[in-house]
Structure formats: C-alpha cells, structure tokens
Amino acid sequence: MNPRTRRTTRTATALAALLALTATACGDDGSTTGEEGAGKGTITFWDNNGGPRTKVWKRIIAKFEDKYPDITVKYVPIPITNVQSKYDTAIQSGGDSLPDVGGVGTAYLANLVAQGALDPVTDRIDDSALKGKLIKNMVDSVRAAGGEDQELYSVPTSANQGTLWYRTDLFAAAKLPAPDSWERFYKAADELTDKGGNKFGFTLRGGAGSIAQALDMMYAQSGIASFWDGDKTTLNDPRNVAALEKYIALFKKVTPAADLNNDFAKMVAQFDQGDIGMLQHNLGSYVDHVRLLGKEKIAGIPLPPSRAGAPRTIVSNPVDGLGLFKASKNKAAAWKFIAFAASPEMNSLWNEDVGAIPANVGAADDDWIAEAPPTKAALESLNDPRTKVVQLPYYLPDWNNISKADNEPGFQKVLLGEMTAKAFCDKVADELNAAQADWQKHQG
C-alpha cells in the first residue's frame, strides 16, 4: 500500500470514527441538550493544561466564588498531553462524565464539535459583556477551527504568535538595525555569521515541529493571505515555494549544522547559550531568553510584512479557549464562570501568568503588557485590522499527521539538498487537497 493510499484510508477511518461518536453523543446519554439549570450550585471545570496552570486557575476560581457565593467550581486538572483523549473517552462512555466547562484549544476543537459535545456560544457572547471585546482575529481562528462558518464553539481566551527574536547586543555591536524587514533580516543573518568563530546569524528548526515554523516564514514572506484558493491549498503557490527556497538556503550558510535535528527545546537552548543573532519561535520562549540572556540583550518582534507598506501576514497559532459542554445540567452557572474568566481583569491575570496574548481587548493597556515589549508587539499586530491571518485547517482529521510526522523527514531532505522545495511543497499540497476533499465529502 503506498503512502497516499494509507493516508486516505487513515483519514476515512478517522472520519468514520467521528461520525460513529457523533451518533453516540446524540443518543439517550444526556449530551444532546442538557439544561440551563438554576444558575447556582456546583459546576465542574476541566483545565486543559493542569499542573502548569493550576495555580492561576485556582486564583481565578477563588475570585469567582467570592463574586458568586452560590456557585462552587470543582476544578479538575488534566495534563495537556491527555486532554483530547480524556474528552473522547468521556464522550464514548455516554457523555455524563463530561465537565460543564472545559479548556478547549483550536487544535482539537473540530473533533469535539463533530461529536456534538459542545454548545455554540455565539449568541451567549452577543448577549454578554464580551460582545465586541474579543480580538477579531482570535474569534475568526476559533470559528475556522470549529469547521462551521457561523458559530463559535468556544470563547477564545489566549493565543500565541510566531516571533522573530534577536540579540540586541550583537546587533548593536555590528551596528545593524532591527530586522523589521526581510531585507534587514537576510543582511543581518549574513553579517552576524562567522563560522570560524562559531558565530551564526540565525538558527532554524529542522527536527520535530519544523514545518510549522517553515509555514510561518513562507506566508510572512509571500504575503499570501489565505491557506485555500477554492478547494486547493496555496502552500505550493510559486510565491510560497520561492519563500521556502530563501529560508532553507540559510541552513549551514548562516546557521549551525546541528539545526538539522533541532526541536524547539534544542533550538532555543542553542540560541540562549551561544552567539547566534536571530531565532524564529514564539512568545513561549521569552521567559527562557530573559533568564539566560537578560532582558537587555533580547528583543522580539512579529515577522516582517512581505514588503514595505504591505499588511502583515500571520499564520494562525492554536487559540486556547473555554467550551460550554452540551451535556451540562447547569449551563447558566457554567456560562457565568466562562464570562468571568474571559473578562478583562481575569483574562489579563491568566495571560500574564502564562506569557500569552490575552483575547479580551480590555487587557491591552495593562502594565504587564507594557513591560513585556514582545507580547505588546504581538498583541498590537494581531489586533491590527490590516493584519491578515492565514487560518490553518486544524479541522482536518489528518492535519497533524500531514503537517508533522508524515512530512518532517521530507523537510530534512530539503535542507540536505536531497529534495527540492517545490517537490516538497507539491507533495504536502497534494495530501492536504485530498484531505480537504475527503472532509468536504463527509460534511455533505
């Protein structure tokens, strides 16, 4: 069986499983409608990153229970690596063990929507203080990830964003301006490289997670604003292929050879402990940079626009949010908790703790954001009406396979010169087009 056949079979199997689970969720398990309830009593909340986020959630819950003394929140921490399977298991067992409220990321939102596990929250948002207060690009990402054009199935709370990190001390020593255009980026990569002195202008990700960062660099340089052109992906558009060629040409010319196998942890460690001028990652590594380099030696900016005066083009990052589960017997109380957690004060508190971009625009002027310039710049770019966000198809059952393990070895071949950028893009595009066609067929 060839890889294309295996992938088609795997996608069909995944879709069949979702349809079967949907049928289960629509049976006599109590997950069809649930109840509004009295707006008081006990509700259950599943934290989708239990452990690292437990402390901040307990602070928010304490404040919520102070405001609503007739509501008690039962907090259940779920490890981030187990959360999707935990939801699936609860649905398959009948839905009664699902929480009232759960943390839901866009990477697996479509899976929950397909199984009928979540209530739409569009009308609830419109009838609440959240109306018009959530960053539009995050709302659009959640809507796209759910696989339905008109409904939101979670309230966005935070997002990450691709960031170009650079060593301000090395740039100052070389009398180079900030890499806020692609011309300045490539010039700095060249001028900061001294292989004999083990100094490099850039470090890239060639190991696990490599394709996600390549997509960031491709669409930011090409300026293409949509992942789809009709039913076909734009991934192998000639402008994206040209951008990928420029990106991979950096390998070993201005980057360490070890980049071939670097995952994010190795790449970030290499940047923080060596003489490397630039790194493309996301806001999540800011704490490490500051801890190891010092705040005065590091800066982070959004990836530059494709050309001077053009709008910035950003590839969507997974958006975290809160979902209202359909089986809840106390939706009124559950919604009070969601609205409270997404309010400006609580949303700011949560995102300050995790170092992410708050979804509520009311948090934009808080002191902690002003004191974290990379986060402030990311928030401003995401909230800029001119910014174009390329919505990745998280709703495709085979998206993770295609964009990760199935094609990461191929990306390494491109870096090594064993495969052309065009051949790589065409291969991935063919697989995505087939997955999209299969998904549309089952949408009926």
Predicted regions span which residues?
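Short, low-complexity disordered leader/linker segments with a strong preference
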Residues: M1-T44, D66, D127, D430-G444
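Extracytoplasmic "Venus flytrap"/periplasmic binding protein-like
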Residues: A62-N137, A173-D180, Q270, G274-M278, ...
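A structural signal for short loop-to-beta-strand junctions that line the ligand-binding cleft
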Residues: L98-D100, L130-D169, A310-I314, V389-P397
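Hinge/lid segment of periplasmic solute-binding proteins
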Residues: T106-Q161, A214, A299-I301, E371
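Extracytoplasmic/periplasmic solute-binding protein
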Residues: A144-T157, G162, Y186-T233, I276
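Extracytoplasmic/periplasmic substrate-recognition and gating elements
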Residues: A174, E245, A249-T255, K266, ...
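Glycine-centered hinge/linker elements that transmit conformational signals in sensory
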Residues: A189-E191, K232-L260
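C-terminal capping/gating helix-and-loop segments adjacent to ligand/active sites or protein-protein/ligand interfaces
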Residues: A378-E431
